[in-house]
Amino acid sequence: MAETAAESGGGGDSGVGACERGVAPIKAQYRTTKERFHEYLDGDKQEGACQEVPTGDPAEPGAKRIRLEDGQENGKTEVAIESRERQVPKRARGQNKSRPHVKPAHYDKDRLCPSFLQEPATPCAFGDRCRFLHDVGRYLETKPADLGPRCVLFETFGRCPFSMTCRFAGAHLGPEGQNLVQEEVVARCAQLPSVRNGLDRALQQQLRKRQVCFERAEQALNRLTQSPMPTVVPETTVAMATPKQNSCHAQLDTVGGAGTPQSSPVPTCGPLTDEDVIRLRPCEKKRLDISGKLYLAPLTTCGNLPFRRICKRFGADVTCGEMAVCTNLLQGQMSEWALLKRHPCEDIFGVQLEGAFPDTMTKCAELLNRTIDVDFVDINVGCPIDLVYKKGGGCALMNRSAKFQQIVRGVNGVLDVPLTVKMRTGVQERVSLAHRLLPELRDWGVALVTLHGRSREQRYTRLADWPYIEQCAKVASPMPLFGNGDILSFEDANCAMQTGVAGIMVARGALLKPWLFTEIKEQRHWDISSSERLDILRDFTHYGLEHWGSDTQGVERTRRFLLEWLSFLCRYVPVGLLERPPQRINERPPYYLGRDYLETLMASQQAADWIRISEMLLGPVPPGFVFLPKHKANAYK
């Protein structure tokens, strides 16, 4: 069944008639029209609960703007809008590539110098050249009002590191403006494990100055270029590249050169272990035994640490960080290293790397192997976006077998943890490649492969091909293969497990309903209430403030990721409203009125209504606030 986009308003069905093909079967007493849906939401607005704010719609291309809005902008009638829609031969879908990019720092122009937040305060290293405010009185005069009486950081950790810049500062500032500390809570938190895998400042400087030695990576790359690599399939010939062709010139150099890999020019001290001089054999590596476990997919943008904490709470067994670009990690970019952070609740955790060159991928793998704590490293061979594909990464590696083999062998040669691969069925819709690559991946040393049952061309315009995944699971044996695609209920999970896969990966299903993991483990449908869903969002904002901070930048960054998640959550249809549970992932919800106002508000697919929900949790948005979701649904017809 084809899956296409439907993003307007609160759904795509404009009538109350019988269920159509591709439309979620909602009970007749709840179905409504587009006009009644928005009249209900606008009529029941609580006075003063939310102010009207621009949502960024005018900055979007006109073809999309017609679909996003109610059809009443600037006083134009519905007939006029429909005539304009007929002039568009094909409606826009996919990503909002031309959306405005507003950083959280934009809303915090008068920032206080960080030196004032140190305890005790330290002199500013920049002096008169500092671009931040040094006048505390002036800062407090211009600072917006607090967003609430409680500070999550102060209550959780006993001390808020943002002091007077916190948007909830009233909860922990003394009568003289001093930052209060709860010594007992601080002492208790000191005994608990903290978030791991941060980037050390000293290491960041070494990376930026290219002073990091990649001895094991150089040795692994030399082995790849000097010895012929065996081919697993006789019909396939792997073309060997010369060392010059095999290198990416814009990457880091090693200290001392590659001519003397046996000895490092950097003096070392301390105990010498076997792992320092003897490379682990594949049979000696740590095993990755996750068969039968629920695997949360590495989700770009939405798969952040606060969201993973939510999914862990509902029963996810395995988590993986968002896709990290290896060249950005080698350059010491803080934003990229933030994707590798691991919360203590993530007991089985991995990171996903994306790259197109064996040298940069191997060096990055060695760097992560000795600096962060993970249970496995995953190579992204499934990313379909043009920015990655045209550079030879993501799905493009499936057509670059020589480079793909060098990357897998090189990365696997420097890791002490298992190596996994996430891939698609292929690049083109009618040309499947996975069944040919899986035996090779098994012999290259890959511990586990996750297969998304769609090609790059298909994106989400087709249902996942689970019969093909079943075929690939047999070909890959004894290497475990996880299946991914269209899991939105425990029935879907049960059917997927019957194909012979070792386990299932959940992606969009977790975005629509993170309690899906509980449903699968308890084998039931959870008719969750709107108040329970709001509590989940409240917990997400608390986790977000812990992770990104409680100052203006942290609050707005938390709001942004909350809104991105709401662009998926709005597609969930409550179980009690369905005629025939469960909801299918390729069925779009029609316009419906929920069992209470909040349930109806959560069903709206307008950015303005998502902002209203965010204001319930994070207070009013700053002046000039703009938001457009990164992803638009193209999975409905």
Curated annotation (Swiss-Prot):
GO terms for molecular function: flavin adenine dinucleotide binding; mRNA dihydrouridine synthase activity; tRNA-dihydrouridine47 synthase activity; zinc ion binding. Its cofactor is FMN. GO terms for biological process: mRNA processing; regulation of translation; tRNA dihydrouridine synthesis. Residues 1-21, 41-63, 85-105 are annotated as: Disordered. Pfam families: Dus, zf-CCCH_4. It comes from the Eukaryota. This is tRNA-dihydrouridine(47) synthase [NAD(P)(+)]-like.
